Structure formats: structure tokens, C-alpha cells
Amino acid sequence: IEHLQNCGLVSAVAILQMLDRNPGKSFADLRRALPTTYGSPTMSPYCADEEKYGVIDRIIAEVQADADSGQTVIGQKIVDVNTVNGVRFTLEDGSWGLIRASSNTPNLVVVVESPTAKKNTVGIFRDIERRLKAYNEVGEFDQKI
């Protein structure tokens, strides 16, 4: 359901389809069956519109180089790097971090999630925060975890 979080109508259709595929189960039953995940709020450090896409390009190169060289984040190798609309890196246990340019504000967007532990979300955020501090173009976060 992760990719549906930004569109209410698409989410509603997906929920109805899940209910249709699972006759005899309520929405509450289906929700209880979902695995627990530990996610962050959307965190947005300032980055000027004219700078943010260049910063993201450099972050993409940095994360890809780390993945290629076997570097770790929270003690886990980066097993996937998705560069569609920013960079999303996935770790061995399925935990991930996302850094992208906001499409409508002078900010970057940072989100992290782990299927295994809250401490992993905090650790991934600390790694992203460390990376972003290296860029003078990136300001303070609006919130942190």
C-alpha cells in the first residue's frame, strides 16, 4: 500500500479490491494482518529551488558509490538504489531511506522506514542527516526523529 499513500481515491479503490479478494474479512481484519513497520514523518530540510536538484544529483552519486563499494548504513549493506525522483536506498533487512527534492517548496524531502525496528529508522535518519550536513546548500530540518 506504500505507493498509494498520496492519493485518496487510488487508496480507496485498492482497499475495496482487497476487501473483494478477501470475502468474509472486515477491513479491521485486513489491517490487523498487515506487518508492523516503523516509519518517520516527512522531514524537510531547507534547500533553495535553484540548488535542490543539483544537491540530489550529488547525493545520488554518493549513495550509489557507497552501495557499489559495499559501505554499510546501520551495519547493513545497501542492496538496492532506486533513483526515480531522488534516491531511495534499501538495506538488507528491507529498511530504507528516501531523499528527494520537493516539487513545490524550497526543501528536500526525507522519509525513512524499517520493517524490523524503530532504532533502524533513527539510525538511517542519522546517516541521511550526516550526508546532508556536508552540503552548505542544505539548511535545518523542519523536524527530526
Please tell me what each predicted stretch does.
Residues I1-S103, N107-V111, K118-I145:
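Phosphate-binding and adjacent anionic-ligand microenvironments
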